[in-house]
C-alpha cells in the first residue's frame, strides 16, 4: 500500500514536484479506492489533534459551569430578598380634580384641609415653610388670615431690656412648631420623629395618593403578624408598622361650611391642602401655560408666513459668476 501511494504521488507530482495537468491528476485520484489510499494532509492531522479536550480544560469548563450556576442562584436569591417590598400595598390612583392639564386646585377643599391640619395634625406635625400670608387670596381673605395669625403667640425680641417676649402672631409669621426641637418631638412620640408636612406630598412616591391611602388604610394586623406596643398596622407604610395612631375618623371635627366630616372627605381635603402647600404655584403655572399656548397659536402662523414669503426667497436665491470680459 505504501508503494502504491508513492507511485501515485510520483504520478501526480511528476519528477521534481512538477504537477500534471489538472484533468489527469483528478482522474488518477478519483480512480483510487479509499481503502487503498489513506491520504492524510497536514491540516487534517492538526484538526484531529485538537478535536479532543485535555483533562485540564475539562476541569476548567466544569468549574466555570458550576460558578455560573452558583452566580445565577445567588442573583435569584438576592432578587427575592429585594422583592420583599412587594408585600406593601401600592396606593391606587385616585381621580383628583386638579390633575387635568388645565385644572386648578379646589380652593374650598384647601380651606377645609387647613382646618383639618389646624385641629388634628398641628399637634404633632410642623409646617416650617408655610406662613399665614400664603393663605391670603387662596382660601382666606386678608382679614381672616390676620385673625388666624392673632390666635397664636409668637416669641419675639429682644426688647429694649434685652429680653424675649411673646406677642400675637402676624401675617408674616410662619405656622408655629408643636415642639421646640427634634429631641423633644421624639421624646413625646416614643422615639418617632413626626415629619414636616410642608413638602410631604412632593417628597413621597405617589404624592397625594400615598397620603390619602396612608390616612385611610389603618386596619387590624393579619393572623401571625405581631406588633410591639405603640405601633399600628398600615399596609401602605414601609414595613407595615407605623408609630402614628389613626389620626382621622368620621366626625373627628366639624367643617365650618357644613360639609359632612366623613373619613374619606377629611382625608381628601387635607391631601388637597398639603398638595397646595407643596406646590403653591400650581394654579399660576397652569395659567401661564394656557397663556403660552394662546400666544403660540398666534405666533406660529405668523412665523410660518414669514418663513414662506421671506426666508424661502433668500434660501432659493442663486449667485451666478460672470467673469470679466
Curated annotation (Swiss-Prot):
<dbReference type="InterPro" id="IPR021157">
    <property type="entry name" value="Cyt_c1_TM_anchor_C"/>
</dbReference>
<dbReference type="GO" id="GO:0045275">
    <property type="term" value="C:respiratory chain complex III"/>
</dbReference>
<keyword id="KW-0999">Mitochondrion inner membrane</keyword>
<feature type="topological domain" description="Mitochondrial matrix">
    <location>
        <begin position="316"/>
        <end position="325"/>
    </location>
</feature>
<dbReference type="GO" id="GO:0005634">
    <property type="term" value="C:nucleus"/>
</dbReference>
<feature type="binding site" description="covalent">
    <location>
        <position position="124"/>
    </location>
    <ligand>
        <name>heme c</name>
    </ligand>
</feature>
<dbReference type="GO" id="GO:0005743">
    <property type="term" value="C:mitochondrial inner membrane"/>
</dbReference>
<dbReference type="GO" id="GO:0020037">
    <property type="term" value="F:heme binding"/>
</dbReference>
<dbReference type="GO" id="GO:0005739">
    <property type="term" value="C:mitochondrion"/>
</dbReference>
<keyword id="KW-1133">Transmembrane helix</keyword>
<dbReference type="Pfam" id="PF02167">
    <property type="entry name" value="Cytochrom_C1"/>
</dbReference>
<dbReference type="InterPro" id="IPR036909">
    <property type="entry name" value="Cyt_c-like_dom_sf"/>
</dbReference>
<feature type="binding site" description="axial binding residue">
    <location>
        <position position="244"/>
    </location>
    <ligand>
        <name>heme c</name>
    </ligand>
</feature>
<keyword id="KW-0679">Respiratory chain</keyword>
<feature type="topological domain" description="Mitochondrial intermembrane">
    <location>
        <begin position="85"/>
        <end position="281"/>
    </location>
</feature>
<dbReference type="InterPro" id="IPR002326">
    <property type="entry name" value="Cyt_c1"/>
</dbReference>
<keyword id="KW-0225">Disease variant</keyword>
<keyword id="KW-0472">Membrane</keyword>
<dbReference type="GO" id="GO:0033762">
    <property type="term" value="P:response to glucagon"/>
</dbReference>
<keyword id="KW-1274">Primary mitochondrial disease</keyword>
<keyword id="KW-0809">Transit peptide</keyword>
<feature type="modified residue" description="Phosphoserine">
    <location>
        <position position="182"/>
    </location>
</feature>
<keyword id="KW-0349">Heme</keyword>
<keyword id="KW-0479">Metal-binding</keyword>
<keyword id="KW-0813">Transport</keyword>
<comment type="subunit">
    <text>Component of the ubiquinol-cytochrome c oxidoreductase (cytochrome b-c1 complex, complex III, CIII), a multisubunit enzyme composed of 11 subunits. The complex is composed of 3 respiratory subunits cytochrome b, cytochrome c1 and Rieske protein UQCRFS1, 2 core protein subunits UQCRC1/QCR1 and UQCRC2/QCR2, and 6 low-molecular weight protein subunits UQCRH/QCR6, UQCRB/QCR7, UQCRQ/QCR8, UQCR10/QCR9, UQCR11/QCR10 and subunit 9, the cleavage product of Rieske protein UQCRFS1.</text>
</comment>
<dbReference type="GO" id="GO:0006122">
    <property type="term" value="P:mitochondrial electron transport, ubiquinol to cytochrome c"/>
</dbReference>
<dbReference type="GO" id="GO:0046872">
    <property type="term" value="F:metal ion binding"/>
</dbReference>
<keyword id="KW-1278">Translocase</keyword>
<keyword id="KW-0597">Phosphoprotein</keyword>
<keyword id="KW-0249">Electron transport</keyword>
<keyword id="KW-0408">Iron</keyword>
<feature type="transmembrane region" description="Helical">
    <location>
        <begin position="282"/>
        <end position="315"/>
    </location>
</feature>
<keyword id="KW-0496">Mitochondrion</keyword>
<feature type="binding site" description="axial binding residue">
    <location>
        <position position="125"/>
    </location>
    <ligand>
        <name>heme c</name>
    </ligand>
</feature>
<dbReference type="GO" id="GO:0008121">
    <property type="term" value="F:ubiquinol-cytochrome-c reductase activity"/>
</dbReference>
<comment type="similarity">
    <text>Belongs to the cytochrome c family.</text>
</comment>
<comment type="function">
    <text>Component of the ubiquinol-cytochrome c oxidoreductase, a multisubunit transmembrane complex that is part of the mitochondrial electron transport chain which drives oxidative phosphorylation.</text>
</comment>
<feature type="transit peptide" description="Mitochondrion">
    <location>
        <begin position="1"/>
        <end position="84"/>
    </location>
</feature>
<dbReference type="GO" id="GO:0045333">
    <property type="term" value="P:cellular respiration"/>
</dbReference>
<feature type="binding site" description="covalent">
    <location>
        <position position="121"/>
    </location>
    <ligand>
        <name>heme c</name>
    </ligand>
</feature>
<dbReference type="GO" id="GO:0016020">
    <property type="term" value="C:membrane"/>
</dbReference>
